[in-house]
């Protein structure tokens, strides 16, 4: 009786031991993600491992097709995704379009070496990335071809690069002669296709009105007189009315419309510079010339096209131009052309009927060529037999209708825009240096910083050497003569 029991007990013990050595597979997950061990691939191992790569890639593709054909619900959402061995280049020799920003744990961005690919390439180092990119990776990688966030983030990136569009002029010189450095954000950093147009003239000569004609392109049937020329003009970019300044409760005093240098950028990226009047009324006589010289020297240094508004022949304006050309400061900017001079256009505003006659226009051109020719300014347009003085006549109008001596106002504005915008744009930088709007703004800031102190220093030296010495010499001679007469 004991022997059968002993044999049964020994048999049961032997079966338990054999069960530990040979486990039985009960179930297997067919839809589980296939894990691959990461490994480092060198360039010399590429040929040897090519067949292995192809087989594994075919298996992965077949497995993905099977999953798409027969999807099965997963009971394990925390299962990590499959890892693939990716090839990146050890060196920095990669195209700019393939550069990628990789996010770190702290939220910082680090420039990647190149575009990640599942196909082995001729690079040296290998890196590991997830086969299923997350939303964070899509938003952070801007150079990968497979990311979905690239197309969505491209318009936002372009909008950030574009400067805000202007709807009114902005002053460049604020109170106390301080340069407005905050205007830098209104200029494009990389745009090189722009034109700088400045205007100079006396008080109430029509400088702001001319810039209003260049600020926007309008149709021929546009009511220019009602919106831009009349006293009730309501669509002027640059102010054309006098400002009222109260005088201790008494009657108001008319102030100039433009009191400081200001600019406006059009949709076509034309930078329009409006200036205060030359030789303004009410300024101190000692600083009147210095104020005008600083503004004129600044525009001669930073403009492509300069409009000189003339009302007859102003010899004071010619004297200031000669002084500004000879005494303007040297700008030490990289690539800037020394002694740069813009293309000059003479505009006769409020011209009368007699000014449109052929003999009168030829006489005016000869006078301007004789006076402004020695300055060296480019005042001509055309070449060969078509070379003539660059002048334009704008009549004094009271409506949009045409008269016996000029066309309608819409046609005159069209001709004026073609004349100004069609002028030769003289470059202010060498050919090897591309002048962008941001670089031009730095040149403008440098000229504004040097112009006013430069002319004040010259005036102080002239006054010390000539004016003060002459007064002292006269007083000394008078005293000497009076003492000799008494003796």
Swiss-Prot record:
InterPro entries (alphabetical): P-loop_NTPase, SMG9
Compositional bias ranges of the Basic and acidic residues kind: 42-70
Keyword Ribosomal protein among UniProt keywords: no
GO terms (BP aspect): gravitaxis; nuclear-transcribed mRNA catabolic process, nonsense-mediated decay
Positions of region (Disordered): 30-83, 136-164
Key words, A-Z: Nonsense-mediated mRNA decay
Family according to the record: Belongs to the SMG9 family.
Function: Involved in nonsense-mediated decay (NMD) of mRNAs containing premature stop codons. Probable component of kinase complex containing nonC and recruited to stalled ribosomes.
Protein name according to UniProt: Protein SMG9
Organism: Drosophila melanogaster
Highest classification ranks of the organism: Eukaryota, Metazoa, Ecdysozoa, Arthropoda, Hexapoda
């Amino acid at each position: 009786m004991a022997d059968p029991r002993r044999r049964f007990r020994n048999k049961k013990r032997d079966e338990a031991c054999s069960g530990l050595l040979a486990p039985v597979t009960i179930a297997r997950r067919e839809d589980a993600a296939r894990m691959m061990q990461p490994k480092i691939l060198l360039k010399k191992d590429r040929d040897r491992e090519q067949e292995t790569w192809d087989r594994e890639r075919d298996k992965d593709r077949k497995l993905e097709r099977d999953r798409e054909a027969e999807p099965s619900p997963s009971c394990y959402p925390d299962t990590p995704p499959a890892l693939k061995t990716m090839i990146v280049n050890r060196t920095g020799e990669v195209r700019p379009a393939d550069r990628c920003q990789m996010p770190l744990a702290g939220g910082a961005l680090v420039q990647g070496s190149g575009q990640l690919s599942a196909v082995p390439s001729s690079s040296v180092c290998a890196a590991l990335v997830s086969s299923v990119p997350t939303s964070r990776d899509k938003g952070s990688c801007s150079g990968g071809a497979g990311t979905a966030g690239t197309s969505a983030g491209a318009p936002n990136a372009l909008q950030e690069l574009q400067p805000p569009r202007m709807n009114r002029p902005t002053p460049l010189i604020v109170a106390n002669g301080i340069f407005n450095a905050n205007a830098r954000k209104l200029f494009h950093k990389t745009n090189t296709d722009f034109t700088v147009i400045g205007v100079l003239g006396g008080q109430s000569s029509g400088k702001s009105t001319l810039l209003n004609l260049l600020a926007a392109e309008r149709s021929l049937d546009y009511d220019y007189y009602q919106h831009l020329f009349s006293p009730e003009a309501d669509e002027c970019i640059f102010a054309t009315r006098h400002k009222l300044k109260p005088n201790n409760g008494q009657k108001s005093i008319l102030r100039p419309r433009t009191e400081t240098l200001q600019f406006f950028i059009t949709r076509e990226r034309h930078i329009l510079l409006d200036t205060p009047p030359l030789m303004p009324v009410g300024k101190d006589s000692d600083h009147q010339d210095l104020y005008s010289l600083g503004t004129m020297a600044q525009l001669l240094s930073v403009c492509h096209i300069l409009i000189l508004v003339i009302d007859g022949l102003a010899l004071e304006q010619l004297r200031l131009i000669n002084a500004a050309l000879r005494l303007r400061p040297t700008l030490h900017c990289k690539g800037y052309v020394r002694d740069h001079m813009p293309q000059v256009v003479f505009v006769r505003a409020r011209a009368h009927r007699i000014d449109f006659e052929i003999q009168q226009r030829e006489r005016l051109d000869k006078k301007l060529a004789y006076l402004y020719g020695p300055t060296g300014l480019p005042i001509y347009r055309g070449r060969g037999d078509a070379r003539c003085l660059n002048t334009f006549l704008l009549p004094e109008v009271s409506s949009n209708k045409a008269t016996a001596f000029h066309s309608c106002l819409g046609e005159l504005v069209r001709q004026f825009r073609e004349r100004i915008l069609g002028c030769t744009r003289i470059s202010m930088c060498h050919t090897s240096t591309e002048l962008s709007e941001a670089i031009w703004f730095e040149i403008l800031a440098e000229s504004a910083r040097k112009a006013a102190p430069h002319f004040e220093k010259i005036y102080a030296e002239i006054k010390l050497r000539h004016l003060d010495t002459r007064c002292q010499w006269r007083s000394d001679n008078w005293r000497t003569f009076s003492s000799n007469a008494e003796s």
